[in-house]
Regions:
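Polybasic/polar functional segments that serve as interface/processing modules
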Residues: 1-33, 45-78, 82-85, 92-94, ...
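Catalytic metal-binding acidic patch
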Residues: 35-37
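Short hydrophobic/aromatic beta-strand micro-patches
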Residues: 39-42
């Protein structure tokens, strides 16, 4: 699966589970870490965990794709590493605090 196809598939799953403020950032020119960041907000800690769980489950079920790693399950910020796409799922307070969009403001925003 190409990186842009992957980010759109991930975003569609998160959107179907009522993730808020979905933002995709093309980071290829800014970092070697990944090609894209996908940022989403959950309405509560339970919602954040449910979004991460459903994303992992649906990506495996629909595409046979598993994350290379998952961090932060016990916090308000869960990171799922899909190689070319890093998915950040935040609670509102953590998203506002870390403000990844500002940190990567020079990167291209992708229409979802």
């Amino acid at each position: 699966m190409q990186p842009l196809e992957l980010v759109k598939a991930l975003a569609a799953i998160l959107d179907s589970k009522k993730a808020e403020d979905l933002t995709a950032i093309h980071t290829t020119e800014q970092t070697i870490i990944s090609d894209y960041f996908l940022i989403a907000t959950g309405t509560s800690s339970t919602h954040v965990k449910a979004l991460a769980d459903e994303l992992e489950y649906e990506m495996k079920r629909q595409y046979g794709v598993l994350p290379k790693g998952i961090e932060g399950r016990a916090t308000g910020w869960i990171l799922l590493d899909y190689g070319t796409v890093l998915v950040h799922i935040f609670q509102r307070e953590q998203r506002d605090y870390y403000n990844l969009e500002r940190l990567w403001e020079d990167a291209e925003k992708i229409e979802l």
